[in-house]
A protein has these predicted regions:
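ATP-dependent phospho-/nucleotidyl transfer catalytic cores
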Residues: 498
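Extracellular attachment/recognition segments
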Residues: 725
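Bacterial Sec-dependent N-terminal signal peptides
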Residues: 1-21
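Accessory carbohydrate-recognition regions in carbohydrate-active enzymes
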Residues: 20-387, 391-437, 441-493, 501, ...
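Beta-strand-rich recognition domains
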Residues: 713-718
């Protein structure tokens, strides 16, 4: 630990000599690790393939043949309130509401060898260990904890494709490292299809794991290297049955045999160590082969200097964090801001070897020509604000992400763009075809300027795939019938928005016929609006409304992760038409006001796993993405000022320091991206548009250091906790008379000034 503190100090001084503040000091990876945040605290670098993090439990997905709801708490492998650690695995999702991964769990132990993980109720029954938050520390590219049962200090760091462990054994006798190839996140009974491992020499182990589940066919290869020779090794197989044993019976495969294969394997490696001696291990992963994993290790971690690897990781984070420099009202705001940037830059993740090879959707090996391939596209979440944020702060990476989506499309047998894809698999989670939105947003904002016909063709083909999720009925009837496909209202509304995004892309490219076709489809939201009730509601295939409608209920009403009160406001591409449809300004503002002030009793979301009380203000469900644009809809009314105090309220209520600081799943950075945009004072209500809706900033000042070399500054004059209302906005010294700025205003550099007051200016942006 002393070495890390010294290294961090040296790194800070190095940054200081470059007149750069060490912004990584404001990041707290523990934020979101309790309750519903589903973030992990471990070591990773920006967009890294490896997320080396502790798992506090690896509970089964089913108990007695039925879904175990407790498994939902472990989407990221770690729960802050747990008292034991099972081990440290190398792949994790950040903030998701469903899960996978948890590959290649390693656990250092000492004393009598145990190969079962045991239980939290009885830690002594297995190899897990008790731990205390008093002896745990998380920071960008670094995690440290003391395993109390073994008195082993564990330090973790990472490069893009390699996880690096440093273990300090207080007692070197009987030192073991367990490699659990059975462990994982969302442990289905038959999740492991096959595992294979071989000892190449006394310091190098290679192998792979193939799993099924959320990703139906997922294969990950590894190379594990130690800085000290293995004294002896062994394994235990837990396969219930063996398809073929044959002539393997002539060997004792369980001890010092150099290769082992099976569905359920745990291995161990013993070392001769002195008391207080350190052991370093490097685990490289590859989607291609063990040879690829070895190349990744050789390229990214050729030596054994843990501190240097750690410092390089900190430097990589500082480089990304310096894309925005902020002054804030209070120190905790700076912690929340840079932690949000950290979470936003965790994914999508690099998916390919250092030589550019990767496993494609067709399970073949492909070469990424001229781009870095990415995976883990949680698109139902991230199209809203994360990818638009990338168009501002990470355009080069977002360009590669679009190329990765198009590669997915080219390899798809359907063919379709990704819906929710990870590790060369389409898992079909959630709804919509929001790749179209991400691509359209990148095209209209000119992040992507090449291969445009290909991009448009991919989006159109995806949107015309009749057998996917009610699209056939949607194209035929202009809505998705509830008795054809569930969550039908949400699907209709989101398809209509995606269609609008396709129309914008077609218009940008100059394809008038496609633009007209999809602009017409974009009006399908009107077909699920019930004038009598004033809500969007589910309709049946015969054209009648589904009976038993309750606009407060989040379950069984045709919506996903929301209710009619929230989802009726989901027409981000046509807010003015939606307002007119709902009865005009006065009635619409009443609806918005009521949404934030009314009560949503627990019974209305008791059957919806992804919604919790922590993410709700009144009836506004911020912990779930469909409502993220809602507070900005005041901008299309004559009372734009009403968004100002509510934005500040959401920023304060849903984003706090501490492990339980997030009001819902971070959803691969979408919740964090909302915070970043809103703290800066503007938000992309409709990705695919070049406009951002103005709000009320939380920062005192922010400088955006853009990739094109320009800087864009946000200034909030008279900013304070009390002064949350905007009385005037100026762009480059000129007063704005509409509550919008354009993407080009940001990218060409300039200054956006908000004049803050303690009372609202009710005439701001007035239409009169």
């Amino acid at each position: 630990m002393k070495k890390i503190l010294l290294t961090s100090l040296m790194g800070f001084l190095a940054w200081g000599t470059q007149a750069q503040e060490d912004l990584s000091q404001y990041v707290d990876p523990m934020i979101g690790t309790a309750k519903m945040g589903h973030t992990y605290p471990g070591a990773t670098v920006p967009f890294g393939s490896v997320q080396l993090s502790p798992d506090t439990d690896t509970i089964p997905y089913e108990v007695n043949g039925r879904y175990n709801p407790e498994v939902y708490r472990y989407c990221a492998g770690y729960q802050y309130d747990d008292a034991t650690i099972v081990g440290f695995s190398h792949t994790h999702f950040s903030g998701t509401g469903h899960s996978d991964l948890g590959d290649f769990l390693m656990m250092p132990t000492s004393g009598p060898l145990q190969l079962n993980p045991g239980t939290e109720a009885d830690p002594d029954s297995g190899y897990r260990s008790r731990f205390s938050h008093d002896r745990e520390h998380a920071a960008p590219a670094y995690y440290q904890v003391t395993l109390d049962d073994y008195d082993i200090d564990v330090e973790l760091t990472a490069t893009t494709r390699v996880g690096v462990h440093r273990y300090t054994f207080a007692q070197g006798e009987d030192a073991h490292v367990i490699l659990d190839l059975m462990a994982g996140i969302y442990n289905y009974d038959d999740k492991n299809v096959w595992t294979f491992m071989r000892e190449e020499n006394d310091t190098l182990v290679t192998g792979f794991r193939e799993t099924t589940g959320w990703a139906r066919t997922r294969k990950v290869f590894f190379a594990l290297s130690f800085d000290k020779p293995i004294k002896q090794y062994g394994n235990r197989k837990y396969d219930e049955k063996q398809a073929y044993r044959g002539f393997w019976g002539r060997f004792n495969e369980s001890e010092n045999f150099p290769e082992i294969a099976g569905r359920k394997i745990r291995a161990y490696f013993d070392f001769d160590l002195e008391d207080g001696e350190q052991l370093i291990a490097k685990m490289a992963i590859s989607p291609v082969s063990t040879a690829g994993a070895i190349k990744n290790m050789q390229a990214e971690t050729p030596g054994w200097d843990f501190d240097a690897i750690h410092q390089a990781g900190v430097d990589s984070w500082n480089k990304e964090l310096h894309k925005v420099q902020v002054k804030t009202i209070q120190e905790s705001d700076k912690v929340n801001f840079y932690t949000a940037m950290y979470h936003a830059f965790l994914g999508p993740t690099v998916y390919g070897d250092v030589d550019g090879r990767y496993r494609g959707l067709d399970m073949n090996i492909h070469q990424a020509e001229g781009f870095t391939n990415y995976t883990s596209f949680s698109l139902w979440d991230t199209y809203r604000a994360l990818h638009p944020l990338f168009n501002v702060l990470q355009p080069a990476r977002n360009r590669d992400m679009v190329k990765s989506m198009l590669a997915h499309y080219d390899q798809s047998v359907h063919p379709m763009l990704p819906i929710w894809s990870h590790y060369a698999n389409e898992n079909w989670c959630m709804i919509g075809y929001h790749s179209a939105s991400v691509i359209a947003d990148a095209v209209v904002k000119e992040t992507v300027t090449a291969d445009l016909a290909h991009a448009l063709d991919a989006a159109v083909t995806t949107a015309q795939t009749a057998y996917f999720d009610g699209i056939g009925a949607y194209m035929e009837k202009g809505y998705v019938p509830e008795d054809v496909s569930g969550a039908s209202v949400s699907k209709t509304l989101e398809y209509a928005y995606d269609d609008w995004a396709i129309a914008q892309m077609a218009d940008k490219i100059g394809n008038a016929s496609i633009s007209r076709e999809f602009a017409a489809r974009a009006e399908n939201y009107k077909n699920v609006y019930d004038q009598q009730t004033g809500f969007m509601r589910p309709k049946l295939k015969d054209g009648s409304w589904k009976q038993g409608f309750d606009p407060l209920d989040t379950h069984g009403q045709g919506f996903i992760e929301g209710n009619a009160w929230n989802y009726s406001l989901y027409v981000p591409h046509a807010p003015q038409e939606m307002i007119n449809m709902m009865g005009g300004d006065h009635r619409f503002v009443e609806h918005l006001d009521s949404l934030f002030s009314m009560d949503l009793p627990d019974r209305y979301f008791a059957n919806t796993e992804d919604i919790s009380r922590e993410g709700i203000i009144g009836n506004y469900v911020h912990g779930n993405e469909p409502s993220h644009h809602v507070v900005y809809l005041y901008n299309w009314t004559d009372q734009a000022w009403k968004s100002h105090d509510k934005i500040r309220m959401i920023l304060r209520a849903m984003y706090q320091t501490g492990a339980d600081g997030l009001g819902g799943n971070d959803d691969f950075g979408q919740m964090s991206a909302w915070y970043l945009f809103s703290a800066l004072g503007f938000y992309p209500v409709a990705p695919g548009s070049v406009e951002y809706a103005l709000g009320s900033p939380l920062v005192e000042e922010a400088t955006l250091n853009l990739e094109n070399g320009k800087t864009f500054t946000v200034e909030a004059q008279n900013q304070s906790e009390k002064n949350q209302y905007v009385s005037k906005v100026l762009l480059n010294g000129e007063e704005l008379h509409e509550p919008f700025i354009r993407h080009a205003d940001i990218m060409k550099g300039g200054k956006l000034t908000f004049i803050m007051k303690g009372r609202p200016n009710k005439k701001i942006f007035s239409k009169d």
